Design a protein with these regions (language model features):
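Conserved ABC ATPase signature
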Residues: 201-205
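ABC ATPase "signature
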Residues: 286-287
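Helical segment within the ABC ATPase nucleotide-binding domain
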Residues: 241-253
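Conserved catalytic motifs of ABC-family nucleotide-binding domains
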Residues: 222
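Catalytic Walker B motif of ABC-type/P-loop ATPase nucleotide-binding domains
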Residues: 226-230
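Conserved ABC ATPase "signature" region
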Residues: 170, 174-197
Length: 318
């Protein structure tokens, strides 16, 4: 018998029509409107009908028993996290715990499950099963209580092109309820060398400038937890190194926790205290970069990554 008791299985599941299911559990874009919808649904109880629920493969929602929460020393804890997209298994029974103040990299190829894992941690994608705790709160049930303490950055998420940098940052700052917002925007502009671009339309910025604006958006609320998806993708080496150094400075000065998904092995080696290697939705290894390279007798994470991709881990360990 699985962990869901017979009494829970006998309960009548909460059922939604297909259009309603798509509305409630559709893949929300990470923008102001999407986050407001999540927060409003969570406050009203519309998003999660019960305190603990599970989505079955056919989309029906059934109750599951409460699980004990972790201590507050963890920034993120996921247990047996699984995600199906119809019949495709995107994330397969993933468990890990990330301590506060650390930088952890999710390393893996396309389709490894990195972005889906981050989206579930944020509460933007509903897990099929498993438990997620973020900053001491159960996700996504308690998302409204924790969203203001975390943020997300990705070069693949565009902000309105016609709005100026200042207008975009103001929208996100108001969404997060940032106090003294004008001063906060000016400080970020100074820290990230954006002063001369504040009143320029986002659509007129270069790729590197847009990345700095995206980072400013991610730091607008001084998050305790920063989630990054390919933060330096398509950037020249100098700009990418500048972004990495600023992230390191922010973590040191604020005691923040960073979780990043990346294909960039050098970036992970330089930024991360710990690496979680994923393949086909499962965790292949989880340790510090140095220990992983030593264990598989490889000089770089890139060599380890290629071994994982080509199924040669056992050969590397011999």
């Amino acid at each position: 018998m699985d962990r869901f008791s017979a009494s829970h299985r006998k309960r009548r599941p909460v059922e939604f029509s297909e259009p309603e299911r798509r509305r409630q559990f559709g893949w929300l874009r990470h923008n102001a409107t999407g986050l407001q919808i999540v927060a409003e649904d969570l406050r009203s109880g519309r998003l999660w009908p019960n305190e603990r629920t599970r989505m079955m493969n056919d989309g029906t929602i059934v109750s599951s028993p409460d699980a004990p929460g972790p201590g507050l020393s963890a920034a993120i804890e996921v247990a047996h996290l699984t995600k199906f997209y119809k019949t495709t298994l995107a994330v397969d029974d993933v468990s890990f715990r990330i301590t506060r103040g650390s930088t952890t990299g999710l390393l893996g190829g396309n389709g490894a499950g990195k972005t889906t894992t981050i989206a579930m941690i944020m509460g933007l994608v509903l897990p099929s099963s498993g438990r997620i705790e973020v900053l001491g709160c159960s996700m996504p049930r308690q998302s409204a209580e924790v969203l203001g303490r975390m943020n997300f950055e990705s070069p693949y998420v565009d902000m309105p092109m016609r709005l100026t940098v200042r207008q975009n940052l103001t929208i996100f700052g108001r969404l997060y309820g940032v106090e003294n917002l004008t001063e906060r925007i000016e400080k970020l502009a100074a820290d990230l060398d954006l002063g001369e671009f504040l009143d320029r339309a986002n659509g007129k910025l270069s790729a590197g400038q847009k990345t700095r604006v995206a980072l400013a958006k991610a730091l607008i609320n001084q998050p305790e937890l920063l989630l990054l998806d390919e933060p330096t993708a398509s950037l020249d080496p100098d700009t990418a190194d500048w972004i990495r150094r600023h992230l390191q400075t922010y973590r040191r000065q604020n005691g923040a926790t960073i979780l990043l998904a990346s294909h960039n092995m050098l970036e992970v080696e330089r930024l991360c205290d710990r690496v979680i290697i994923m393949k086909r939705g499962r965790i292949e290894d989880d340790d510090s970069p140095d220990k992983i390279m030593a264990r598989y007798n490889r000089a770089t994470l890139e060599e380890v990554f290629l071994d994982v991709a080509r199924g040669r881990l056992q050969e590397g360990m011999q």
